[in-house]
């Protein structure tokens, strides 16, 4: 998803979540004095964390392939045979997004929002998040709404949505969707959104609204030793990692408001991982070790998922995500260069759009196959699968290039940013004084 930051300078380019935070042009973490993030004052000019942008694309593809299992009997069959245990745990890609969101939002905004609560700064942050998330989401909600108008003339809402619970299509249901509040009123995620994975947008929007208050606490912990912060990150994830079906603390099915525990644990864990990464210089961490460490951690996650074999026990892998993200943020050398490839960067920047559009094409594929005259043979299934994959790629590009980014820039331009307004006032004051209009 999904999931879902505009500094007072150039437009940012990175964004982890289906709710998709961007990096506000953030610098490499823990890379020495020249790149060190101030502990109490924000820097205003920062390069992108390209490695995390690439990770966002990988996480989005993980979720997409998890949902594409309806096509596992097409030409994609070899992919699913080879990576079945990993793809079966594709819902963990959502947790990657949530942890990334906490990490990058904290890295970008902690020093702006943390020292003390200011309504203007908090409002600027919330508006930046709204401008990033809402336009593309609202458009997809509208398209899916038309899809329901067409389909429910023949099928029930529940059947047409391909969910176990029917989403609310009433005017109030539409209002909840457009306000991105649709998950807040439900104990479970199924049926909360008009399209399955849309629940993550609502969850992440709630996390963003809470962050200005959370930042007040995190700012007081910003000088934690990196090992202590990393330990806090892992401990924060324990409730969502060990409690559930087929986990060390087993439950009978999913529990009410489990989604709230999931977003809270992952987002806060990402925040602590950020504190650990930005303080890495305190333990004289060698950035040259970050790349190999990230590769080792990622490999360990894949091996663990392949061994676990099913989504229940595989959920324990979430405990490794803070370490993986922290190490990637510190990565230098060839791995950073490889992850900075243009196609990975574009995929990461457009990952929110990919997350939003892909499910619609899966719906199309399912219903076309089901209602195909005289049944769809292998050739038809392969052709439809190819068309749907191409449609996903094209729709992602169009939504990102012509809706998500332009709408974000226009909405941000409607409200002057705190930093920009301050600079404008200072410039006006200097100009006034230089013209002799000020007091001597």
State where each predicted segment sits:
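Membrane-cytosol interface segments of multi-pass membrane proteins
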Residues: 1-242, 251, 263, 350, ...
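Membrane-interface helix-boundary motifs at transmembrane edges
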Residues: 217-225, 276-288, 308-311, 336-341
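Alpha-helical transmembrane segments of multi-pass integral membrane proteins
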Residues: 263, 267, 271-272, 291-405, ...
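Regular secondary-structure segments
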Residues: 107-114, 274-278, 326-329
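Acidic, glycine-rich loop-and-beta core segments that form the ion-binding/anion-interacting portion
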Residues: 250-258, 262-275
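Juxtamembrane/transmembrane-helix interface segments of polytopic membrane transporters
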Residues: 144, 148, 152, 274, ...
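Membrane-interface helix caps and helix-loop-helix hairpins in membrane proteins
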Residues: 190-195, 248-257, 303-313
